Amino acid sequence: MKILIIHNKYQSNNIGGEDVVYKNELNALCEKLGSENVFCYEVSNDNINKFKLLFEIWFSKKHYKVICKIIKENDIDIVHVHNFFPLLTPAVFKAAKDSKSKVVHTLHNYRLWCISGILYRDGFGICEICAQKKFSLSGIVNKCYRKSLLQSFVAQLAFCFYKLTGAFNNIDYFFVLTNFQKNKVKSLGMDEGKIILKPNSLQMSFNMRIQKHNYAYVGRLEESKGILNLLEIWDKFDEKYILTIVGGGDIEAELRRKYKKPNIIFKGKCSREETMAIVSHSKYLLQPSLWYETFGLTIIEAMSAGVPVIGYDIGTRGDFIKDGVNGFLSGPDELKSVIEKSFDYIDYDSLSKAAKESAKQYKNEYVIEKQIEIYKNILENKI
């Protein structure tokens, strides 16, 4: 069995969870199947030429030809695509289909239904206005793609074109990451027979015996991630509640100016190693995201280090956080009281141990074995 993994990487100054998952998955597959059986093709948004992209975003002939060539020369059985937008385009799906390979696409976001990819709009909240339409002006008017009217227009037009031309019909199966996401994409009209639940995996090597203290937030600094709500709450706490914030974003400078308190520590963007050092030394990870999310990589990373997680009971959070077992779930108006309850929680050690145990099911070796089994079943038409 030979596999081709394809990914359109984000800009190097804005590496997202998708990039981390892609690299981790690629390495794990190479280790399990041998590098002679696993191939990769990647491009980066660092190399975007905006003028050329206006003409190539509809269907990239260049990438179509390259993918066809790779498949033919290496007898590829399965093509697994992570992100395809905006450089690769759905041309990669057609190339794989025309070359008689099976095609799998991991849904790391909701961009097939929403150009922002997150089904959330700043100042509005959870938003599915565009999800049931082939073309919607809402995403354009509200500048939902990169907060740009022009880029939102092009993105909306592109996905309308993809749908009208049946570009996604070339995908045999879609990998979803949680039960919540599976039910959500079904509700948005996806054929249940094409959906396969396959979570992300994680390389775990943390020592939970580290002395833990404080709270940590890891993520982009933007409204949809809940950082504004979190800081409004923290502003009311006394100084014994210490919050370390890892991440950057357009509103970072504004937040630093507004919240100059000794118990609110902005670290900015950190390397993966620095981030995990901060998380593993924290008593709790806070996950206050206001949108559904598709997975919870930071949640699993924290739990693998024995760090319980506190998050809103929205979207995928319930797939990972069991209230009072390995962390706490909060309603929209209860986060402050939940954090206060967590501070001197009498049974913290049990939370920590349960968090560590919860993360084990996402170990690389378990998930990759399952993934390989899924690949085999797809090739043998057993799904």
Residue ranges and their predicted role:
Residues 254-273:
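Nucleotide-activated donor-binding/catalytic signature segment of Leloir-type glycosyltransferases, i.e.
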Residues 276, 299-304, 318-319:
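Short alpha-helical segment that forms part of, or immediately flanks, the ligand-binding pocket
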Residues 347-362, 370-373:
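A short, well-ordered alpha-helix in the C-terminal region of glycosyltransferases
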Residues 175, 200-202, 207-225, 231-235:
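Conserved donor-binding/catalytic core segment of Leloir-type glycosyltransferases
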Residues 132-206, 267:
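Donor nucleotide-sugar binding/catalytic pocket of nucleotide-sugar-dependent glycosyltransferases
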Residues 269-270, 278-282:
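Short alpha-helical donor nucleotide-sugar binding micro-motif in glycosyltransferases
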Residues 280-294, 307:
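Acidic donor-binding loop of glycosyltransferase active sites
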